[in-house]
Amino acid sequence: EINAPLSEYGGPSGWNDPDMLVVGIGGKSMSIGYESEGCTHEQYKSHFALWCMMASPLLCGNDVRSMNDSTLQVLLDRDLIAINQDVLGKQAERSIRADHYDIWVKPLADGRKAVACFNRADTPRTIELNSKTVEDLSLEQVYSLDSRSMENAANNIMVDLAPYQCKVYICGKPKK
């Protein structure tokens, strides 16, 4: 949320840094002004996905000496790290801010777009992804980071999101 208005300032000459990743910290926290039970695994995955979309520095806030397998799985996601480290260096911009979800779009150096659909609600949600919801979006080729496979998308994709889930897609054909 804090990075949303800063996209024009982020890039190869300077990176917007919203602080450290909370993936794997676990346990109770008072950092939000009241005691909470911490994040679920799905929330950690969403946090990391959005962080990567922002091209933010990947600084771990957890104890890296004692990471469990699920934390490692999140933090070592090659596809998300590739989006974060894309040489174009652009930060994602919020394309849609609806009542309970966001759509973020990050241009990539090869001409494709990384698109993140994030459910901010504590209830499941289905959103439609197409050229009306994201300007100039090509669905000619769509790679889902969630399923690690190509999606069949004629004119749209119906994105089913669990509470607080973020799904990321790479859309379009790479430019040669």
Regions of interest found by a model, annotated:
Residues E37-T40, Y101-V105, N156-I157:
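Generic recognition of flexible, low-complexity loop/linker segments
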Residues S29-M30, C60-G61, M67-S70, D122-R125, ...:
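Flexible loop/turn segments at secondary-structure boundaries
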Residues K28, L58, R65, L88, ...:
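Short, glycine-/Ser/Thr-/acidic-enriched flexible segments
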Residues N152-K176:
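C-terminal beta-strand-rich structural cap/linker in extracellular carbohydrate-active enzymes
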Residues S46-S95:
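Catalytic cores of secreted or luminal carbohydrate-active enzymes
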Residues K132-S147:
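Solvent-exposed beta-hairpin/edge-strand motifs
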Residues W51-M54, L59-G61, R97-V134, Y164:
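Carbohydrate-binding surface patches
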Residues E1-N62:
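Glycan-recognition surfaces
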